[in-house]
Amino acid sequence: MINIEQRGARQVVLVLDQLVARMDDMSPALAEIGEDLVESMKGRFASAKAPDGTPWAPNSPVTITAYLGLFKGSHKKDGSLSKKGQQRAASKKPGTGETKALQTTINYQLESNDTVSVGSPLVYAAMFNFGGTREKFPNLWGDIPAREFAGVSDADRENILEIVGSYLLGA
């Protein structure tokens, strides 16, 4: 004959009640996830790599020329690049203009107790992330390659799981 005794059943019920209450309001965990994803996405501008680690397409010669035109001393009198201009051109990463507007406007917003959105409010953020062709967008001066910054990397996924696990367990 098997005899089953209940020991600590109240504690189990209490822990389960706390777990259910935490699941009803995930906003603290989502806020932490949002903050971490914002930093991760901003970091992609420094590395010039997509969430999967692939490098972004380099700047076009037209972009480099326009960028160098912002600075005095980029060109010699004969029109060739000065040493300073060469250094500027070599160090220019995609999406890192003088204002750094795109990377500095990445933010998160809690939409509800179970949803967080992360991105940039800038109109051109989607074009930067997904790219576009003149065929689909006739107003473009040329095709724009995708330079994915918005997304979740493997490291981000692991971090999200850790945050959710810690939050649900009350750690």
Regions found by a protein language model. Name each.
Residues M1-A171:
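Short, Lys/Arg-rich flexible segments
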